[in-house]
Amino acid sequence: MLLEVMFMKKYLVFLMAALMLVALAVAGCGGSKDEAKAQPEKVLRVATEPTFAPFEFQKEGSEELAGFDMDLIRAIGKKLGCKVEIANMGFDALIPALNTGNIDVAIAGMSITDERKQAVGMSDPYYTSGLIVMVKKDNNDIKSIDDLAGKRIAAQIGTTGADKANSVKDAKVTLFNTNTESAMELTNGGVDAVINDSPVIGYYLAQGGSEVAKTVGDVMEAEQYGIAVKKDNTKLLEDINKALAELKKDGEYDKIYKTWFGEVKK
């Protein structure tokens, strides 16, 4: 009888330890401390708008998403011990999806602005960009944004490029869901210019767009990209900032940067 009692005590101790390990394993990556207990597995639900090469784009003939942002968020997920699941959605749908809890993270070349910081939590900056004007290659009349007054301008909805276009006097601004559509409208003659982020337009030109288009003027309004989370998810924001700092310290960030942009900016 004594042996049976001792065996049962050892069994109960082992069972409690196993249950504690299971409880730790099922804590989710994206939630707060309370929300984490309800997560079935360690998954970081990420969303992006995949027409913003070289930051995020869909590989030709594949459903796989590639780009600087995609490599970066996967590296952050690895630091956090999370499985990263990435969904596609329109750029203007990203912040609403965060606020409704449908996703944990949005990364899509998203500029850190005061307006966005009112709506969501923004990480420390991970890339510095700026805006540039693109016109057709044979257009010699438009030399800078100062020449766009009264012209037809294309931009991507919900972006700082759209804000800049709307600030041009008497301009007729057409907003598109994707950067690809904006560039196509320029090629087809539907607009006189496109305003978008400099690295995105630069990548488009490098991939063959230079045969039909060119940039004019200087890079405008240096802006920094950040990773967005739900406003009250401070724990996840802290974890992302910590992971980002570690990636910069251990050289992994520089490795990813060099893959997509060549020489590393110091």
Where does each model-flagged region fall?
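Acidic, polar ligand-binding/catalytic clefts
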Residues: 70, 83-147, 214, 218-219
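Ligand-binding clefts/hinges and TM-proximal coupling segments of bilobed small-molecule sensing domains
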Residues: 31-34, 160-176, 212-219, 242-266
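Short loop->beta-strand "edge-of-pocket" segments that line small-molecule binding or catalytic clefts
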Residues: 45-48, 66, 145-158
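Periplasmic-binding protein-like
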Residues: 50, 128-135, 198, 202-244, ...
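Extracytoplasmic small-molecule ligand-binding "clamshell" domains
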Residues: 38-109
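Extended ligand-binding regions for polar small-molecule ligands
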Residues: 70-79, 139, 157-159, 226-264
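Short helices/loops that flank or line small-molecule/ion binding pockets
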Residues: 78-79, 87-88, 92-105, 119-121, ...
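Short, low-complexity disordered leader/linker segments with a strong preference
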Residues: 1-43, 265-266
